[in-house]
Amino acid sequence: MRIEVESLTEAGKPFAHTYRPEEIALDEEEHARLTGPATVQGSARRRGEEIRLRGKIGAEVEVSCDRCLAAVRLPLEVEFDTAFIPQAAEAVKTENVELLSADMGLAAYEDDAVDLDELVREQILLALPSRRLCREECKGLCPVCGADLNAGECACEPGGTDPRWSALADWKDKSRKS
């Protein structure tokens, strides 16, 4: 969705859009995808060349559990407040090395329109928790055979150590005896 800069005033103009899951490609490395429509609504204001967007995004995202890789659905409600400046003005600002706190919420627009799609995608990804678990007591996968330990115990011997660590274990035993 594009918001035309020329149509905006200081009083503000409301906007709303519903994205289909295939319209927003989330990060494949994050193993995240939309499971249904994502809605965005808010208002856009213009003060000089600066455009300020404030609003809310609602979506449901499916991610993989960090321990057992099971699919986990996360409902997200994200509020945003972002200022946009023209691409040319942003190029002038980036000549300074120091980033001021006032510049932290700045993004750039070009061609006299603000592209809302990338903002929505970024805000959804930023709202994802850093630790994604199917449940707090998730046992994860067996490091030897890969069995899901939530479904039951596997046949692997507990306490087995990797043979690559045997030299360190020998050194530890020798240092205890000395």
Region spans (language model):
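Structured interface patches
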Residues: 1-178
